Each structure stands twice: as C-alpha cells, then as structure tokens.
Swiss-Prot record:
Gene from which this protein is expressed: pgk
Protein name: Phosphoglycerate kinase
GO cellular component: cytosol
Catalytic activity annotation: (2R)-3-phosphoglycerate + ATP = (2R)-3-phospho-glyceroyl phosphate + ADP
GO biological process: gluconeogenesis; glycolytic process
Native source organism of the sequence: Ligilactobacillus salivarius (strain UCC118) (Lactobacillus salivarius)
Pfam families in the cross-refs: PGK (PF00162)
Entry GO MF terms: ADP binding; ATP binding; phosphoglycerate kinase activity
InterPro entries, sorted: Phosphoglycerate_kinase, Phosphoglycerate_kinase_CS, Phosphoglycerate_kinase_N, Phosphoglycerate_kinase_sf
Gene3D superfamilies, per database record: Phosphoglycerate kinase, N-terminal domain (3.40.50.1260)
CDD domains: Phosphoglycerate_kinase
Binding site for ATP: K211, E329, G356, G357, D358, S359
Keyword ATP-binding part of the UniProt annotation: yes
Length: 400
C-alpha cells in the first residue's frame, strides 16, 4: 500500500509536527557524526520552503536517571541544525507545558523549532518508549499534521512516532512519511519484495541469534546469502570444522545445521580466516584455511574468502549488506570488511544497499558511499525490515 508522503500535504501556515532521528553521538556537547541530522534536511527544507512551521521531535540515547538529562540534551543538535539550515532554530528545553506551547504559538511560517529529547518523558514511567496514549494525544494536539521521517526508530512503537500518528488520524488529521522514510521504504522494500536477480545478501556480525530472522527470510528471496563475521564460526561448528577459540553460540549450532540444510548451495561461508592467539589488534596473526588450530581465534576473513565473495557478487543486480566481516574496530582485522565495501563500489550495474554501523563506516572510510545506491539510516529497523516484519512507525503513517 502506497503511503502518504510529505509532498502530498498542504503545509502552508500549518504547524507540522515532525519525528526525526537526531540520535547522534555527542560527547561533552560536541557532535561526533551529524549524518542523521543531514539526512533529515530535505524534509525539513520542504516544510519551511512551503511556509509550514516545522516542530521537530527526536530522542537521544536512553534516559535512566535525572543526571542523564545534562549529557543527553538536544541543545547541541539545535545549534548544528541551525548551521546546516543557515537559519535560526528555536530550542525548547521542555517536552510539555506552557514553555513549549507558547514557543509553538509564537512561530511564524517557515520557522523551525526543536523540542527537548522525547525520552526525558521516560523518567516518569517510560511514557515515550512505552507509547503512553495520553502523551501521544498531547503532542498531537500541538500540531495540524504529522510527518514521520525517523526510520531509525520505525521498528519501535513510541509516543513520538506511533502515538502522534494514531492520535492525529483519530482526529481526521494526516500523518505522512518524510523523504528519508520514503527512500528507505522504496529501496529496502524493493530489494526484499521485488529485487532484480541475481540478488545477493551479505550478512556479518557476531551473533547468529541477531541475524537468524534475516537469514531465514532472505534465503527465501535471495540467490545467495554470504555469511561473514563472528557468526561464521557457529556455522563452522555445525559443519564439523574446528574453530579453536573463535566466537561460537553453542546453543545455536543445531539451528545453524537446520539453516544449512534448508539453504543448500545458497549459503556462502568463508574458506579461510585471519587468526590470532588473542583478541588484540597487535596480536601476531596468520591466515588459516579449514580447521582453526587450538588456541587460535578467527578475527577476520582471509584473502581466498574475499575472492570467493567477490566472485559471488560480480554478476549481482541487487546487493544488500548488513554487518562486518571481522572485528572491524581493530584496524588489523578490518581488511575483509573494507575489501567487501570496496568491491561493492565497483558494481555500477547493481542496486547496492548498505545498513548497520560498521558496514556504513567502512564504505564512508573508503570514500565509496556515493557509488552505492542507498545507505540505510536504521540499524535495528533495517534488519527488521529485511526480516519481512511490519514496522509500527511505517504502518502508522496514513495510506494514500
């Protein structure tokens, strides 16, 4: 079902409540990476260029105690957003009450206002992350229309995305998707529902348990599923390959056997690994084919695996990649991840979609991000979408 998009709305003179994902790393008031702020700009610009009043909501981190508020205020985000928009952004250090209501009522057409971290509401009974209906209704009462542009939280049912949407729709008002959400639905949705073949999925990361739903779902859709990263060794154990001291989920070995039986030749595993005796960037390492000796642990895929994966990918028309091939945060064991990223940048005829923090960091580090079709902004959300799950934040948007 096609969803209502921000460009379908008449926003002129209207108070547009917009859920953005400004959950960015901040240390001592300094933003480490502003990608998520930049990603929201097209939708914000559409609203203000069409004389709407943009009232922005976002969470930042997790608030567990009163002291967390100081570190997790969105004030630095408002300052960065003002620089990016090249216009003032009103920051309201409150999530409800007269201060917020007055600030909204004093807005002119084309103004931008950022509400304080929505999770400040979690201190008193998890009202935001528990989707408290009264909070959703209250926030909805502050505006005329709602735009959800936060794909990063689309898999969560919170007051600031699902709560506002539902309350708006109950009052006969519209809830639309922003451009970022639309893009995610388009690329991730098409990749899973109507991909061009050959379709190859690359799944990395430490745990089979994190990716099990995705592997199972994609085995039914993809022509090949490449597995790398720490979860490889649970599959090795299931195949009877010795894994030394490598990471393994013993309680998932039977599951790995079932997946391999179901997959047949669709599942592609590494054939060699970069191994070391300790989990340390400076540990001496060697490339090992087949069985991993006792006392050694695999920390990255080896050169023959890179060749095998490139051979599997070279004719692909659709590629989805989520998760690293090794211990990406250690530079000596990042090569496998970087090689896969570099190769994806050469696939000019394919739709290439990357999600997950380490995979995204790899393509940005390599400078190939602009050669890929789409970089997903949602970690958990993109994984759940790839599992074929309905995401509450998307479901709550009005249909066209």
């Amino acid at each position: 079902m096609a969803k209502l998009i921000v460009s379908d709305l008449d926003v002129k003179g209207k108070k547009v409540l917009m859920r953005v994902d400004f959950n960015v790393p901040i240390k001592n008031g300094v933003i480490g990476n502003d990608n998520r702020i930049v990603a929201a700009l097209p939708t914000i610009n559409y609203i203000i260029e069409h004389d709407g009043k943009a009232i922005l909501f976002s969470h930042l981190g997790r608030i567990k105690k009163e002291e967390d508020k100081k570190e997790l205020s969105l004030r630095p985000v408002a300052e960065r957003l003002a620089e990016l928009l090249n216009k003032p952004v009103t920051f309201v250090p409150a999530t409800r009450g007269a201060q917020l209501e007055d600030a909204i009522n004093n807005m002119n057409d084309g103004d931008v206002l950022l509400v304080e971290n929505t999770r400040f509401e979690d201190l008193d009974g998890k009202k935001e992350s528990g989707n408290d209906p009264e909070l959703g209704k209250y926030w909805a009462s502050l505006g005329d229309v709602f735009v959800n542009d936060a794909f990063g939280t689309a898999h969560r049912s919170h007051a600031s995305n699902v709560g506002i949407s539902e309350a708006m729709k109950a009052e006969g008002k519209q809830a639309a998707a922003g451009y970022l959400l639309e893009k995610e639905i388009k690329f991730l949705g098409n990749a899973v529902d109507s991909p061009k073949h050959p379709f190859v999925a690359i799944l990395g990361g430490a745990k089979v348990s994190d990716k099990i739903g995705v592997i199972n779902h994609l085995l039914g859709k993809a022509d090949k599923v490449i597995v790398g990263g720490g979860m490889t060794y649970t599959f090795y154990a299931a195949k009877g390959i010795k894994i030394g001291n490598s990471l393994v989920e013993k309680d998932k070995i039977e599951l790995a056997k079932e997946i391999m039986e179901k997959a047949g030749d669709k599942l592609v595993l590494p054939v060699d690994n970069v191994c070391a005796k300790e989990f340390n960037n400076d540990a001496p390492s060697e490339v090992v084919e087949g069985d991993i000796p006792d006392g050694y642990m695999a920390l990255d895929i080896g050169p023959k695996s890179v060749e095998l994966f490139e051979d599997t990918l070279k004719d692909a028309k659709t590629v989805v990649w989520n998760g690293p091939m090794g211990v990406f945060e250690m530079s000596n064991f990042a090569k496998g991840t970087l090689e896969v990223g570099k190769f994806l940048g050469t696939l000019s005829d394919a739709t290439t979609i990357v999600g997950g923090g380490d995979s995204t960091a790899a393509v940005q580090q390599l400078g190939v991000a602009d050669k890929l079709t789409h970089i997903s902004t949602g970690g958990g959300a993109s994984l759940e979408y790839l599992e074929g799950k309905t995401l509450p934040g998307i479901a709550a948007v009005s249909d066209k």
